[in-house]
Amino acid sequence: MSKQVGSDRVKRGMAEMQKGGVIMDVVNAEQAKIAEEAGAVAVMALERVPSDIRAAGGVARACNPKIVQEVMDAVSIPVMAKCRIGHITEARVLESMGVDYIDESEVLTPADEEYHLLKSDYTVPFVCGCRNLGEAARRIGEGAAMLRTKGEPGTGNIVEAVRHMRQVNSEVAKLTVMPDDEIMTFAKEIGAPYEVLKSIKDNGRLPVVNFAAGGVATPQDAALMMQLGADGVFVGSGIFKSEDPEKFAKAIVQATTHYTDYELIGKLAQELGEAMRGLDVNQLSLEERMQERGW
């Protein structure tokens, strides 16, 4: 009997259901409940938020399954969990637990520096990071059902997420007006599957949702990314490293939904305490930049 895998249509449909929403990193059941009450469409269960992973250094692995299970038991919204790039067993364990999505994440220390997971081989849908159309198309070709900007996680600095969202969108726009006989050469140049690029050209958009992630620290950041074309927002360290996580969580959800209501966003910001402390990305060495992981 052949093994069962989820179809691309079903997986992508599940991801589409999160469109326009906020997905929040949580490290325990209590935080997961705060996120759910604030209006998050899903939570990402992990042992440490990206800023703590960055500060601790060393090897960052998949979350203890016990924490993932506790979060799954605590909330009714979808639960995501991260695995290391290329780590088949971490992904299979999460799949066996029944998580709703797996994030093959550059936030964790890569297990394989040459190969990403063949995500089409799993029943559970995957989300992956990308900085440009080449990375986006490769992940889609492997079976990713959802994309997000890599940004620079754990910095509270939105600049890299902005760069990556603009880069992907500009390259998609370029592709849509490209003559068909040039697509193969373009595919070779950016190392992307021809079939994926042809589909993007024919439809005028990516075949999967693309969320903003990596550096979202304020309601204004979330609204900015939505204005730039993000389908939704991931918030990692920004909420639970702020002065008032409950207020921050609700404010970011509101700002994501009403991202052109500047009066509302201004009022939300006035009621908040201090945001997480940020890092200047330019001061990070190449080895410290999580966005450089994967290919």
Swiss-Prot record:
It is an enzyme of class 4 (lyase). Catalyzes the formation of pyridoxal 5'-phosphate from ribose 5-phosphate (RBP), glyceraldehyde 3-phosphate (G3P) and ammonia. The ammonia is provided by the PdxT subunit. Can also use ribulose 5-phosphate and dihydroxyacetone phosphate as substrates, resulting from enzyme-catalyzed isomerization of RBP and G3P, respectively. D-glyceraldehyde 3-phosphate binds at R166. Its EC number is 4.3.3.6. D-ribose 5-phosphate binds at D25, G154, G215, G236, S237. Pathway: Cofactor biosynthesis; pyridoxal 5'-phosphate biosynthesis. GO terms for molecular function: pyridoxal 5'-phosphate synthase (glutamine hydrolysing) activity. The active site is at K82 (schiff-base intermediate with d-ribose 5-phosphate). In the presence of PdxT, forms a dodecamer of heterodimers. The gene is pdxS. Belongs to the PdxS/SNZ family. Keywords: Lyase, Pyridoxal phosphate, Schiff base. It catalyses: aldehydo-D-ribose 5-phosphate + D-glyceraldehyde 3-phosphate + L-glutamine = pyridoxal 5'-phosphate + L-glutamate + phosphate + 3 H2O + H(+). This is Pyridoxal 5'-phosphate synthase subunit PdxS. InterPro entries: Aldolase_TIM (IPR013785), PdxS/SNZ (IPR001852), PdxS/SNZ_N (IPR033755), RibuloseP-bd_barrel (IPR011060). The keyword Transcription regulation does not apply. The keyword Lyase applies. PROSITE patterns: PDXS_SNZ_1, PDXS_SNZ_2. Pfam families: SOR_SNZ (PF01680). One of its GO terms (biological process) is pyridoxine biosynthetic process.
